[in-house]
């Protein structure tokens, strides 16, 4: 993360990749930034691809990266997807289904036998693990290594885990997607996405579709993503320590009815996660006692923790997910928590005062 993506040619700026304002180049190997990217995005792709021993392609957002995978499917395709995926991905899938473009098989991510069956019948198997916001972990070693129908693509959204905690390509996945907006960037100041694969044919298809969809990352965004990625290991180490401690304390609090964090032995997929994840991430969800209004009240009373959407920054954020359109199936008292790098006792003091209020 620290050494990759640096130009070591004598006389070149080693410390940071240059940000070039020009959107075109005099004819050579690179002509136009929408089709060919920039030297800054090249450096970013070297860095991110190296994290998973693959080849990376950067995008203007995580949703742009996801759309390139989904919209490559021809009419009549079948997609296997978790019951409660990220709502943006669900929006694309639901729209395509309503238009008759594809059929959708919605599966409990913990139901490994169902996913193994899907490998024999579906054109795309889309896994999101840990899943947003219930934190269900898929059995990636079993699913990704299982026999599949010729042409079936296994894609893994690894945003919550990051490459530091799981390596889907090593397990047999075809492509990994990250919303680099989140933990890779890490400072809540950019939009970016990435696809990583070891399949050169897929990589070139993704590159062509990135060109067609105008989804190439900007130079400044690529620069910011590189800057953020340099410290990801340090940030994740601190955030995961905080997350584990908060999960333990919240689980013991009388005003909390349930905590969903893969690192807790009480989590339904903890045993699966422990077999292949090297860390459990900085994302969790918990449910308050009472009704949905109680969860909203807790969010509004927090002083240090930000009540806002998005996640993965150095600051801790929380959000009541059931109020998001399309997320009505989520328990009304569930709050998703993205744990940051603050002092854990400061965070806990904030929770105590918010939960103590009537």
How would you label these PLM feature ranges?
Residues 1-19:
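Short conserved active-site loop signatures built around small residues
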Residues 100-103, 116-117, 140, 235, ...:
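PLP-dependent enzyme catalytic core of the Aspartate aminotransferase-like
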Residues 258-335, 339:
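Conserved C-terminal alpha-helix-loop-beta "cap" of PLP-dependent enzymes
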Residues 206, 296-303, 350-355:
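Short amphipathic alpha-helices in soluble, non-transmembrane regions
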Residues 3, 7, 56-253, 260:
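Conserved PLP-enzyme active-site core in the AAT-like
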Residues 23-24, 197-202, 229, 288-293:
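Short loop segments at secondary-structure junctions
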């Amino acid at each position: 993360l620290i050494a990759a993506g640096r130009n070591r040619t004598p006389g070149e700026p080693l410390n940071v990749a240059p940000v070039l304002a020009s959107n075109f180049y005099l004819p050579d190997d690179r002509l136009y930034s929408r089709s060919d990217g920039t030297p800054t995005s090249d450096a970013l792709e070297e860095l991110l691809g190296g994290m998973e021993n693959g080849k990376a392609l950067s995008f203007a957002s995580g949703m742009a990266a996801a759309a390139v995978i989904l919209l490559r499917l021809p009419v009549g395709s079948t997609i296997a997807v978790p019951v409660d995926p990220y709502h943006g991905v669900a929006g694309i899938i639901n729209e395509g289904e309503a238009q008759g473009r594809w059929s959708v098989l919605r599966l409990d991510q913990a139901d490994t036998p169902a996913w193994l069956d899907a490998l024999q019948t579906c054109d795309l198997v889309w896994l999101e693990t840990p899943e947003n916001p219930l934190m269900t972990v898929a059995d990636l070693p079993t699913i990704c290594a299982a026999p599949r129908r010729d042409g079936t693509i296994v894609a893994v959204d690894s945003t919550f885990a990051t490459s530091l905690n799981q390596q889907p390509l090593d397990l047999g996945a075809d492509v990994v997607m990250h919303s680099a907006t989140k933990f890779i960037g890490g400072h809540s100041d950019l939009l970016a996405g990435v696809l990583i694969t070891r399949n050169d044919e897929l990589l070139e298809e993704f590159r062509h579709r990135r060109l067609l969809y105008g989804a190439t990352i900007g130079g400044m965004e690529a620069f910011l993503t590189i800057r953020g990625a340099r410290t990801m290991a340090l940030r994740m180490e601190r955030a995961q320590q905080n997350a584990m401690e908060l999960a333990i304390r919240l689980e013991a609090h009388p005003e909390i009815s349930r905590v969903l964090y893969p690192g807790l032995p009480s989590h339904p997929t903890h045993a699966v996660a422990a077999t292949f994840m090297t860390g459990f991430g900085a994302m969790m969800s918990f449910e308050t006692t009472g009704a949905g209004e109680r969860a909203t009240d807790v969010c509004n009373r927090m002083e240090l923790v930000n009540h806002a959407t998005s996640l993965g920054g150095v600051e801790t954020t929380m959000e009541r997910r059931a109020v998001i359109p399309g997320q009505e199936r989520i328990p009304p008292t569930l709050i998703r928590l993205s744990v940051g790098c603050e002092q854990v006792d400061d965070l806990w003091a904030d929770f105590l005062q918010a939960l103590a209020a009537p």
